[in-house]
Amino acid sequence: MNNKVESYIGFSIRKGAAVFGVDNITVTRKHVHVILHTSSLSPKSLSNLCFFAEKIGVPIFCVEEFDILQKKNCKAIAVCDKSLAKAIIENLK
């Protein structure tokens, strides 16, 4: 199941429908559909991310540290494609 989520994240990156990092996510002008973060995200960044997710009304999930995120040295990613976000949400529930 987690391989599917990692694949969907890869698809969104290749499509250009992903935003990396807490700072970039909170200031993006793209329409965010789901936010994913790793467990190693700092508490302050996590609170900023949760506040932003609640403000715009999108789900936020904690995921494993996938290879894709480790290569980018990234702890948070937002998916801006509606269909990919829906597939990720369904696989994480």
Task: Indicate where each model-derived feature is located.
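Fold-independent oxyanion-binding glycine-rich loops
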Residues: 22, 39-40, 80-81
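Short amphipathic beta-strand starts and helix->beta connectors
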Residues: 20-22, 59-64
